């Protein structure tokens, strides 16, 4: 048995152990022995002791400064770190648990389980590093397939791609997070797939609400959640999306499952990158963003894809600062997306939810080659009616509806019915409205909007189309309205 006194003592001469030479907020400079400088992205560990409390923190190497000094970003607050303190090189990048063990669990960026206090210790059998290469070109799936959501406005006008990247754009308070929660519910119910949720720089309260709602809906056990919230250091917020994506990749590549990856909010990912870039001393680019914004975004987005027969479909909430779509953060994200769902403050103010703007939302598969001629023709007609109505609004505001031609009056009337019919009861809104959510099959959606555009329902009052599922609901509502009016 080795005596304690003869054991090696950690010092500057021991490989894999360095000493802190500088602490500037979340940025820590560490000097290592010349022959054992760890590579960029390696995880380092050290312990902060304040009084009787000890906390282990993880740091990730971001730069080699020269003179045997590396610069690392701390993933927890650095209060209590001192110069000369020892830091251990783990010899590998940050890694997270993968596999079925992740379902029904809440993790932080380094893969620690957050919702197992007082429970039995959970054995982690496999971990993957969060920095991984995207699939090779010859491994990618070449077929394009529609991802049906059961939400009318999305399926008809901005159809999602199986294995694609979808952006939910909108300012504060227009319903991005609620729509993401709705999609988690629908995927669990209708697709039976696995969901992975990345909470990137959002409010802790929202994360808590999401977990409680998922437990109530019975979908929590099919979802892995990874959180790096608003109050955490920028290094955590920058890496948490990669931690969640790594868990999703395991289900796709090893379990051969289709996965839905939710990221809320991708703007906070960009914002964290900007903070880290500034802390590392890089010269800022346009509007103060990091000079490697496009590169950082590409590293994340290129890993979200379909391989042969299996897919990761990503739904990303994207906050638009001051509703400015030319801001570099949302503008850089646009290039990677297969579909964009823009949430409109004006539509939300009229009480029409989901508040999707049908004229500015887009999808690359809104094409007869992918959807069929009937779907494409119906979507095109609906958009044409809504666009014509938008053009006529200025005339109506000045002269009134009575000054329009008979043809234009019919167009405006049908457009109003279409606008009302694009609203829909959602499962997540039941607690506010008291009305059960509805799922509308794509075939019904196409037929319904085609009939409204043809004028088959011109005799039905506009209010009968509000917040309903299909035309059967409209007819039922219309009968009730007629009875009430005698």
Curated annotation (Swiss-Prot):
Catalyses which reaction(s): ATP + H2O + 4 H(+)(in) = ADP + phosphate + 5 H(+)(out)
A GO CC term attached to the entry: plasma membrane
Q: Name one Pfam family in it.
A: ATP-synt_ab_N
Membrane-topology descriptor = Peripheral membrane protein
Q: Among its keywords, does the record have NADP?
A: no
Q: Which InterPro entries match?
A: AAA+_ATPase, ATP-synt_VA_C, ATP_synth_F1_bsu, ATPase_a/bsu_AS, ATPase_alpha/beta_chains, ATPase_F1/V1/A1_a/bsu_N, ATPase_F1/V1/A1_a/bsu_N_sf, ATPase_F1/V1/A1_a/bsu_nucl-bd
Q: Which SMART domains match?
A: AAA
Q: Which GO terms describe its molecular function?
A: ATP binding; ATP hydrolysis activity; proton-transporting ATP synthase activity, rotational mechanism
- Enzyme Commission number, as recorded: 7.1.2.2
Location in the cell reads: Cell membrane
Name the enzyme group at the top EC level: translocase
Hydrolase as a keyword of this entry, yes or no, is: no
Give the UniProt keywords, A-Z.
ATP synthesis, ATP-binding, Cell membrane, CF(1), Hydrogen ion transport, Ion transport, Membrane, Nucleotide-binding, Translocase, Transport
> How does this polypeptide assemble, per the annotation?
F-type ATPases have 2 components, CF(1) - the catalytic core - and CF(0) - the membrane proton channel. CF(1) has five subunits: alpha(3), beta(3), gamma(1), delta(1), epsilon(1). CF(0) has three main subunits: a(1), b(2) and c(9-12). The alpha and beta chains form an alternating ring which encloses part of the gamma chain. CF(1) is attached to CF(0) by a central stalk formed by the gamma and epsilon chains, while a peripheral stalk is formed by the delta and b chains.
Q: Quote the function comment for this protein.
A: Produces ATP from ADP in the presence of a proton gradient across the membrane. The catalytic sites are hosted primarily by the beta subunits.
**What is the protein name for this chain?**
ATP synthase subunit beta
Q: What does the organism's lineage look like at the top?
A: Bacteria, Bacillati, Actinomycetota, Actinomycetes, Micrococcales
What is this protein's gene name? atpD
